[in-house]
């Protein structure tokens, strides 16, 4: 159980706490010296004008590169969050990775909850660009985890092979993974697994530390889509999220392997409900029930998730703000996937396609991973219903093409639930 002292120790005022409690000049001196070194580095940084430090983004194709201007950079360059995170650290992954051939990446991350406020002049336009016009300066994000509102949640299993819903949650008071110290990573792991031990019934399970798994066990879990990949993605490595791997990383799952929690990958936690077949309503019901129970258990231990009414749940990448939810299916659509209207149909249904194994993978045997594009501005119930209605439309199109009938491109969905 995390004590108040433990939370303060990993918070923003550790050096002041040590000095006040008199726990020793050595510890206090180390922390203060670290702060002094960082402050000295920032002062050295200021010797150069912002124009001399501005990144070359002329060949970049990501949201950060599109929104960052010399004026915004000059305004934000020397600002730091309470944990010492800077604008240059936020954007480095987008500077190092110009873009993606199929998916427009965000190009920046947050190092802590405060990053979204301190660097709002850049984060806000990036969020608006990435999230279909959602403006965090004037809009509020809705939350709804009432799975009973879902309709027509059973897919035709001749086409839909598996169903999955995931989200992320961050623990308030600790840095996000790009800025996490080893101590903070271990505290995240401790907070999470201590809470998860309280899950009962069909949610009960156990935790597996990555550092204690064999290579064969890890790869088997990855191949079965239970475990996150090894941190080889440049988007993760350039953001600093692969540091100290596999320290304090792991996976918790129930005994049926239908409810899983990843620890300390891109986010503090990723909560996942999944199963074979096409019963998305059941998957979402378990997701909502499990997520509510995890939050209750964490709150019982004196912690809470990062959340505010503008951005919803706070996560590392701006692409996952709001619900953090991705509801997806593996669906076999050999005829529709070859139709020239396929991409437009997906766009109008607010869906996206990935290969069978996710981003940057091919579709094996005409099986695609289809999921919602949006994360913020719509509730969890709305997003899952969009996926259900959209996938049913795709399956209906596939059946028509099998019969030699024509299909239509549906009208675009209204923005943010507008009628």
Swiss-Prot record:
Question: What's an example GO BP annotation here?
Answer: phosphocreatine biosynthetic process
Q: Which domain of life is it from?
A: Eukaryota
Q: Where in the cell is it found?
A: Mitochondrion inner membrane
Q: Which GO terms describe its cellular component?
A: mitochondrial inner membrane; mitochondrion
> From which residue to which does the transit peptide run?
1-39
Residues that bear Phosphotyrosine: 255
Task: Identify the main location.
Answer: mitochondrion
Region Cardiolipin-binding, as annotated, extends over 40-64
Q: Which residues carry this modification: Phosphothreonine?
A: 356
The membrane topology of this protein is:
Peripheral membrane protein
Q: Which residues bind ATP?
A: 162-166, 225, 270, 326, 354-359, 369
Q: Which residues form the Phosphagen kinase C-terminal domain?
A: 159-401
Phosphagen kinase N-terminal domain location is: 46-132
Q: What biological function has been recorded for the protein in this entry?
A: Reversibly catalyzes the transfer of phosphate between ATP and various phosphogens (e.g. creatine phosphate). Creatine kinase isoenzymes play a central role in energy transduction in tissues with large, fluctuating energy demands, such as skeletal muscle, heart, brain and spermatozoa.
Name the protein family: Belongs to the ATP:guanido phosphotransferase family.
Protein name per the record: Creatine kinase S-type, mitochondrial
Q: Which gene encodes it?
A: CKMT2
């Amino acid at each position: 159980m995390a004590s108040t002292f433990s939370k303060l120790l990993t918070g923003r005022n550790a050096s002041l706490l040590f000095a006040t409690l008199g726990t020793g000049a050595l510890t206090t001196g180390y922390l203060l010296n670290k702060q002094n070194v960082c402050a000295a580095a920032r002062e050295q940084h200021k010797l150069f004008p912002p124009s001399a430090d501005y990144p070359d983004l002329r060949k970049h194709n990501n949201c950060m590169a599109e929104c960052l201007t010399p004026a915004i950079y000059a305004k934000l360059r020397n600002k730091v969050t309470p944990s010492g995170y800077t604008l240059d650290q936020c954007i480095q992954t987008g500077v190092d990775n110009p873009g993606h051939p199929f998916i427009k990446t965000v190009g920046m991350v947050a190092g802590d909850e405060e990053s979204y406020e301190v660097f709002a002049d850049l984060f806000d336009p990036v969020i608006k660009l990435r999230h279909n016009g959602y403006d965090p300066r004037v809009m509020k994000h809705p939350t709804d985890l009432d799975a009973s509102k879902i309709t027509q949640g059973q897919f035709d299993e001749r086409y839909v092979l598996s169903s999955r819903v995931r989200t992320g949650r961050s623990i308030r008071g600790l840095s996000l993974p790009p800025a996490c110290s080893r101590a903070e990573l271990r505290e995240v792991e401790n907070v999470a697994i201590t809470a998860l031990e309280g899950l009962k019934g069909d949610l009960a399970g156990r935790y597996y530390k990555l550092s204690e798994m064999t290579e064969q066990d890890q790869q088997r879990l990855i191949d079965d889509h239970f475990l996150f990949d090894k941190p080889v993605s440049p988007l993760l490595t350039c953001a600093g999220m692969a540091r100290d791997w596999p320290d304090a990383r792991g996976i918790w799952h129930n005994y049926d392997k239908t409810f899983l929690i990843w620890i300390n990958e891109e986010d503090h936690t990723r909560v996942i409900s999944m199963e074979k077949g096409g019963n998305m309503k059941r998957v979402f019901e378990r997701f909502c029930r499990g997520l509510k129970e995890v939050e209750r258990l964490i709150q019982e231990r004196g912690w809470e998730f990062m959340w505010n009414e503008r951005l919803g749940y706070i996560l590392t990448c701006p692409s996952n703000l709001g619900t953090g939810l991705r509801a997806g299916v593996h669906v076999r659509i050999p005829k529709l996937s070859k139709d020239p209207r396929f991409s437009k149909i997906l766009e109008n249904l607010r869906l996206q396609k990935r290969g069978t194994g996710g981003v940057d993978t091919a579709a094996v045997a005409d099986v695609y991973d289809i999921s919602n594009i949006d994360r913020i501005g719509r509730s969890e119930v709305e997003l899952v219903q969009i996926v259900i209605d959209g996938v049913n439309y795709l399956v209906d199109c596939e059946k028509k093409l099998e019969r030699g009938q024509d299909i239509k491109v549906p009208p675009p969905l209204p923005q943010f639930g507008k009628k």
